[in-house]
Each structure stands twice: as structure tokens, then as C-alpha cells.
From Swiss-Prot:
Record key words, sorted: Kelch repeat, Phosphoprotein, Repeat
Domain named BTB: residues: 140-196
Pfam families: BTB, Kelch_1
Residues recorded as bearing Phosphoserine in the entry: 64, 67, 87, 107
Name of this protein: Kelch repeat and BTB domain-containing protein 11
Cysteine-cysteine disulfides: none
Start-end of Low complexity biased regions: 12-31, 79-91
Length: 623
């Protein structure tokens, strides 16, 4: 009977030409010479034990150590062949092909290591296991195979955090596909510690994708939160692109949130803004404008009495102006003003103009501090405040230094109108970061004091010695036009646009009239921008809770109402809608006192700005 040939297990002979091997070679049958190698290196194995001569030779080889000149090249292969009955997971790694008859060699790695190298040449890495886990869970009882490497973990830890591992809790060896080795290491560290460390913009996409594949939603959110502070103009678009390719909504929204929070920087960067689609650009701006909740704010600028008549040549009050140069936020629930931020160093606090564009507060021009000659001069500096990051930054300076200017926002541009003894007007394009001249004010318009607002895509400026002239600027034609003037000759406090109307607030009584001659009051008239017609809105009345004397104030529109702010108090004016009965005087509106006065020095300029809410705001979804 011919015996089946077993695979050869070859060793270099200590003496290739040793006596006895040649004699046994001649006595062997053809079935006993199964391979083409020299007969002195082969033996056959049947169902019974091999012939005595071969057994003696094998016993001699086992008892005598191999010579130093010949390394061991082949082991007993029949033991390795028994691995064919193992599962595919056990065959995936060379370490699983251990002989069942031989005890497994103890691992040379410390117990705190999670990773078994696939080959002895590759070193292992320390495990991200917090102290005390070994005592609680014992030795790792799960082997994770990924990218040819093996990681050890505890089934109980992973099953408690993931349905994916809970459904596979019966397996001792688990091959993980679709997740990179780097991502799996970070996810395991997060599963043990609850902290996502080591996430960077260049690997966050694979970490979030791995967390979704392994059903670790908490890890995906922590990875997104961890990479948020690392986003910048240099990497935000790459992160967004990776998130869109892999449909990672959390990461995509984080990139959109960064871009909307830093909208001006993104707008000026062609490598980012130029690669966004039109829908994405609209989404960023929409998120920016709807972020948080709109609040009433007021900037304290310049000392008291320094409104429209302070000349740049006078250096008095510079130090005092800097002391109260801050922005305050009105908290309606508490009825009080609280400081939000202070003007940055280098921003003049007297005679500057301010407005809001893209939910940024811009401050431009003003009276610069006195120079070496002791004379103050107009400033050309421009700064902007970002409420999303609570930070100030410098913007391209004006082409011409200005004080007592009016700064307005219209159709995504800034307009610096006039100034003391100036008729010129310039426009700022935030995307190009450039100021450019536009049509100047008509000659003989007004030298210093004027009010300005925007309505229906046009700029309206009122001024003159008696504040009765009204001019309109059409940006499409780049020209100024004369509008019907108001019949009022009272001292104007401010002018603000709301719902297609321009509301003008006048302090009753002429400039030279004594305050004791009669009660002080405020009259309101409005101009219909389409009908081009003035009409009275509120007859002169005293502000509720206000002082007996006239107090100049400034106005801002917010949530369908107009807020009047001065150092004496804060009032809300609610115009009557069409067809409604009037307010205090029966002519269409009334005043309501709000909170306590703001105890600061200087002129208060109110405006509306959206401040971030907690938790982080943002419009979910994508175009």
C-alpha cells in the first residue's frame, strides 16, 4: 500500500554526507521518496510511524543541535496544516497559525498594550487605557484586526458604547473593514476615556466616518467638536469637501459654522469663497444673519456734548473719551445695560461713524489723538467687531481721513458719507477689501451736521442748519437727488428707516427757545419713500419717565419698533400700523419707557446686532 506523502519539514543537515543516510535511501520504496530534494533530506509519513532508519535519523536530528553555519529553514508542517479547520478570522493573521499541541508563547508586550503587531518586526504601541481599567475588566478579550494590524480591547467597554460591537459580542476575533487604523485607535481611546484626542483637520473625516460605521454617535460629535477650534481659512474648505464626499453631516455643519462665524475672512479668500456654490454662499450669509438673537446695543463714543460740533483741532477730552469707549448690551428682562466689549486700541472714540454689515459692527474715522504738535486730526482707521468670536480686527483704512462722518451699510457695501467740511463719499467692497470714491454730496449741501439712513436700496441724508433738507443717493445711477423737505423746523434728534418709511424725531422748541417756556417734548414725522411724501406721526409729547429738560437721543430699529437711547433713559417707540388707532397723541404711535439710564459719559449710538446663543447656534442642513 502506498502511503500518502506528508509535507516535508527540512533542516540543514549537520553532516550532509553522513553514513547511514545513503543506505536507508537505497532501501526506501518509490513511495518513500516523495520530493525531488535529496533523499537524505526527505522522509515519508503514512498512517503508521515512519521506517526505523528514518525515525533514527529524525531522533538524531532532534537530539543534536544544528550547526551554527546553517539556519533552520522549515518546521514540521503537518501541525500547521491543522489550521485549515480554523475560521477565516483565525487565518487572517500569521499569529493565529499557532500549533494546537504547543502552548501559546507568552506575549512579550506589557499588559497595558492594546495592539499586537502583525509581525515580530513591527513594534506595538501603548494602549490608551485609563488607570484602573485592567483591574475592573481584566485582560482584553477581543482582538480587532484592521489594515493588517491587531488591536486588543475589552468587549464590555465597546459593547456598552456601540450597537455594532454589542451585536458581535460572541466573537473573540473581529475583522473591522472600512475604518483606518488611525481612526480605530482614536475611537478606541475615546471609548475608554470619553475624550477625543489626536483629531486633526486632516484626519477628522475618517474618524467621523469610522464612528458612524461602528455606530459610535457620541464619538462622532466629540471628534467634530474637537476639530472645531483647529479650523482655519487654510483647511476649512478641505474639511468641507471631505465631509460632503462622505456625507458626514456633523462635520459639514461644523465647516459651515466656521465659515459663517468668519464670514468676512472667507469672503476675502478666493480659494475658499470662489469655490463655493451660489447656494452655499447664500447659506453662509443666512446662517450669519440669523445666528443667535438680535439685541439692542449702544456704543458710548466721546465725552458728553461732543456730538456734531467737536472740531478735530481741539485735543480736549481725548483721555476721557477713551475711558468710556465701550459697547453695551441692553438686557430687557433685567431692564439694564451691561458692557459687552471695549473699543480696540487705536479706534478713535470721538466723531466716528458706525454701522452694522453682515452682523459685524464697523467703526470708521473719528478724531485721532493729538500728535506731537498738540493738534488732533481726523482719522482714517476702520475696525470691525465680530460677535461670533468676540474679537476686533482692523479693516482697510479710508481713502480720506474723516471725522463726524456717517457710516451706512447698503447692498453688501459700506458708505462713508461726508464728514466735517467734506462732501466726498467713498464705498467699501468687503470682498475686494477696497475703498473707492463715488458721487460726492451736492455743493452747498451741509458742512457738518447731518443724519443718514437707508431705505429701499437707497441712502437718505438730512441736514443743513435747520435739519430740513433731504437728499437721496441712488447707487445704480451713482447720483444724488433732491427729495421733498420736511415742514418741521425743530431740532432734529435722529432719523431711522422702518417698513418703507423714514421716521424723523424732532425735539420740540427751537434752539434758542428757553426750556422753561413750556414742557419739553418729542414730535415724530415720517416720509414715505415710494410716495415721496411727509406726514405727521406723533404730535409733541413728553417722554414717559424722562427728564424735564430736552435730552438729545439717537435711534435704532429692532423687531418692528424704534428704540430711542440717551444717557437719560431708553424708550421704545411703536408706530401704529395702517388703519390702527393712534398712540399717546392719537396720531399713530406711542413711547414706552424701558429700564434705567446708562451711567456713562459721551454720546450713545444705538444699533441692533445678533449675539450668539448657547448652545451654538446655526441653521442645520445644507443646500
Amino acid at each position: 500500500m502506498e502511503h500518502a506523502v506528508a509535507p516535508c519539514v527540512l533542516y540543514p543537515g549537520t553532516e550532509p554526507g553522513a553514513a547511514g543516510e545513503s543506505e536507508s535511501e537505497g532501501a526506501a520504496s518509490p513511495a518513500q521518496t516523495p520530493c525531488s530534494l535529496g533523499a537524505s533530506l526527505c522522509f515519508s509519513s503514512g498512517e503508521e510511524s515512519p521506517p526505523q532508519s528514518l525515525a533514527s535519523a529524525a531522533e538524531g536530528a532532534a537530539t543534536s543541535p544544528p550547526s551554527s553555519g546553517g539556519p533552520r529553514v522549515v518546521e514540521r508542517q503537518w501541525e500547521a496544516g491543522s489550521a485549515g479547520a480554523a475560521s477565516p478570522e483565525e487565518l487572517a493573521s500569521p499569529e493565529e497559525r499557532a500549533c494546537p499541541e504547543e502552548p501559546a508563547a507568552p506575549s512579550p508586550e506589557p499588559r497595558v498594550w492594546l495592539e499586537d503587531p502583525a509581525s515580530p518586526e513591527e513594534p506595538g504601541e501603548p494602549a490608551p487605557v485609563p488607570p484602573g481599567f485592567g483591574a475592573v475588566y481584566g485582560e482584553p478579550d477581543l482582538v480587532l484586526e484592521v489594515s493588517g494590524r491587531r488591536l486588543r480591547a475589552h468587549k464590555a467597554v465597546l459593547a456598552a458604547r456601540s450597537d455594532y460591537f454589542r451585536a458581535r459580542a460572541s466573537r473573540d476575533v473581529l475583522r473591522v473593514q472600512g475604518v483606518s487604523l488611525t481612526a480605530l485607535r482614536l475611537l478606541l481611546a475615546d471609548a475608554y476615556s470619553g475624550r477625543m484626542a489626536g483629531v486633526r483637520p486632516d484626519n477628522v473625516a475618517e474618524v467621523v466616518a469610522g464612528a458612524r460605521r461602528l455606530q459610535l454617535p457620541g464619538a462622532a460629535q466629540r471628534a467634530t467638536d474637537a476639530v472645531g477650534p483647529q479650523l482655519s481659512l487654510a483647511n476649512c474648505y478641505e474639511v468641507l469637501s471631505a465631509a460632503k464626499r462622505q456625507r458626514l453631516n456633523e462635520l459639514r455643519d461644523a465647516a459651515y459654522c466656521f465659515m459663517s462665524d468668519h464670514y468676512l475672512e472667507v469672503l476675502r479668500e478666493p480659494a475658499v469663497f470662489g469655490r463655493l456654490s451660489g447656494a452655499e454662499r447664500d447659506l453662509l450669509l443666512r446662517r450669519r444673519l440669523r445666528a443667535g438673537r438680535a439685541h439692542l446695543l449702544a456704543a458710548a463714543l466721546g465725552p458728553a456734548g461732543e456730538r456734531a460740533g467737536s472740531r478735530p483741532q481741539s485735543p480736549s477730552g481725548d483721555a476721557d473719551a477713551r475711558g468710556d469707549a465701550a459697547v453695551y448690551c441692553f438686557h430687557a428682562a433685567a431692564g439694564e445695560w451691561r458692557e459687552l466689549t471695549r473699543l480696540p486700541e487705536g479706534a478713535p472714540a470721538r466723531g466716528c461713524g458706525l454701522c452694522v454689515l453682515y452682523n459685524y459692527l464697523f467703526v470708521a474715522g473719528g478724531v485721532a489723538p493729538a500728535g506731537p504738535d498738540g493738534r488732533a486730526r481726523p482719522s482714517d482707521q476702520v475696525f470691525c467687531y465680530n460677535p461670533a468670536t468676540d474679537s476686533w480686527s482692523a479693516v482697510r483704512p479710508l481713502r480720506q481721513a474723516r471725522s463726524q462722518l456717517r457710516l451706512l451699510a447698503l447692498d453688501g457695501h459700506l458708505y462713508a458719507v461726508g464728514g466735517e467740511c467734506l462732501l466726498s463719499v467713498e464705498r467699501y467692497d468687503p470682498r475686494a477689501d477696497r475703498w473707492a470714491p463715488v458721487a460726492p454730496l451736492p455743493r452747498g449741501a451741509f458742512a457738518v451736521a447731518h443724519e443718514a439712513t437707508t431705505c429701499h436700496g437707497e441712502i437718505y441724508v438730512s441736514g443743513g442748519s435747520l435739519f430740513y433738507r433731504l437728499l437721496k443717493y441712488d447707487p445704480r445711477r451713482d447720483e444724488w437727488q433732491e427729495c421733498p423737505c420736511s415742514s418741521s423746523r425743530e431740532r432734529s434728534a435722529d432719523m431711522v428707516a422702518l417698513d418703507g418709511f423714514i421716521y424723523r424725531f424732532d425735539l420740540s422748541g427751537s434752539r434758542g427757545e428757553a426750556q422753561a417756556a413750556g414742557p419739553s417734548g418729542v414730535s415724530v414725522s415720517r416720509y414715505h419713500c415710494l410716495a415721496k411724501q411727509w406726514s405727521p406721526c406723533v404730535a409733541p409729547l413728553r417722554l414717559p419717565g424722562g427728564p424735564t429738560g430736552l435730552q438729545p437721543f439717537r435711534c435704532a430699529a429692532l423687531d418692528g419698533a424704534i428704540y430711542c437711547v440717551s444717557r437719560a433713559g431708553t424708550w421704545r417707540f411703536q408706530p401704529a400700523r395702517e388703519g390702527e388707532a393712534g398712540g399717546d397723541a392719537g396720531q399713530g404711535g406711542g413711547f414706552e419707557a424701558l429700564g434705567a439710564p446708562l451711567d456713562v459719559r459721551g454720546v450713545l449710538i444705538p444699533f441692533a446686532l445678533s449675539l450668539p446663543e448657547k448652545p451654538p447656534r446655526g441653521e442645520q442642513g445644507a443646500p
